[in-house]
Regions:
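Hydrophobic beta-strand-centered segment that forms part of the acyl-chain substrate-binding groove
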Residues: 8, 28, 42-77, 81-89, ...
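Hydrophobic residues in beta-strands and at strand termini
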Residues: 17-18, 64, 110
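N-terminal "first-domain core" detector
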Residues: 4-43
Length: 146
């Protein structure tokens, strides 16, 4: 199979925070945020690979910097920033109500698997374009050694 080189492009998903998404403090429950976070990262990878062949390996450093409350619209911006032989890493940046400051950010490593759920090559190569892309590429690459 031929290798496909991609440039990181952003995939956006949005969520409305509702009362059932809140914790006992009245802020967005971390578990719900993690669910949406993984889903957003998965969608970025699934735009490149068959979703049937993608599994989540690890969430790296999902850092919360601000809370969200009922009625907030939360935006998940995801992009594939690194690809190994069988692994592929998404970076997810979360903000609310159009604010510039991050609500949550982090990386997720996914693995490309065959029909027997064994890791197999995906033949994707990531070519960073911007300084931010290069920084995210190197950061994601270094996650492999941790």
């Amino acid at each position: 199979m031929e290798t496909k080189t991609i440039c990181p492009t952003c995939t956006v998903t949005m969520r409305l925070v509702k009362s059932e998404d809140l914790n006992h403090h009245g802020t967005l429950f971390a578990g719900r945020t993690a669910e949406w976070f993984v889903e957003s990262g998965f969608i970025a990878v699934a735009s490149l690979l068959n979703p049937q062949n993608i599994v989540c390996l690890k969430i790296h450093g999902m850092f919360f910097t601000k809370p969200a409350v009922s009625g907030d619209v939360v935006k998940f911006s995801s992009k594939v920033v690194f690809a190994g032989n069988t692994s592929i890493v998404s970076y997810i940046h979360v903000e609310k109500n159009g604010a510039e400051k991050s609500l949550v950010e982090g990386f997720i490593t996914f693995i490309h698997v065959d029909e027997n759920n064994k890791p197999c090559p995906h033949y994707i190569n990531v070519s960073p374009v911007t300084e931010e892309d290069r920084y995210l590429y190197e950061t994601a690459k270094n996650l492999r050694t941790k």
